[in-house]
């Protein structure tokens, strides 16, 4: 564990060290979450897995508002199609449709050429729960297949 911690604290970290430490610290949610975030940052192609693990930890610990905060924080720092899709879903679950629309419109104006923005706009225009769910699933599958540069 000591060598993993040393590797995770290095300037050029080995991302797998952060993942191992997250798994090792699963009994301590805050530490595990910090390592999953570190892993996602340094291995973007695996970020959706990390975010899903973080969501599960937060739900297991009944920290539901923190799930929303996670995705808001990610979107403040930079654009992430997965974070946008999940945050829109969360806002819709809370029936905060205006906030969801404002969020999507903000990214539509920023000219990000990501399919998630347009698909989420389409999702918001639908009243059907099944259609919304299908669009969310489509977004997530497309995002899993993309490679971040």
Regions from the language model: what does each represent?
Residues 16, 48-49, 82, 116:
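Start-of-helix register in tetratricopeptide repeats
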Residues 9-11, 15, 26-27, 51, ...:
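Alpha-helical solenoid scaffolds in eukaryotic macromolecular assemblies
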Residues 35, 83, 90, 104, ...:
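Generic L/I/V-rich hydrophobic alpha-helical segments across diverse proteins
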Residues 12, 44-45, 78-79, 112, ...:
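Short coil turns that delineate tetratricopeptide repeat
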Residues 25-27, 60, 93-94, 127-128:
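Register position in tetratricopeptide repeats
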Residues 1-7, 30-41, 64-75, 97-110, ...:
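Alpha-helical repeat scaffolds
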Residues 18-21, 53-54, 87, 118-123:
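Structural register within alpha-helical repeat arrays
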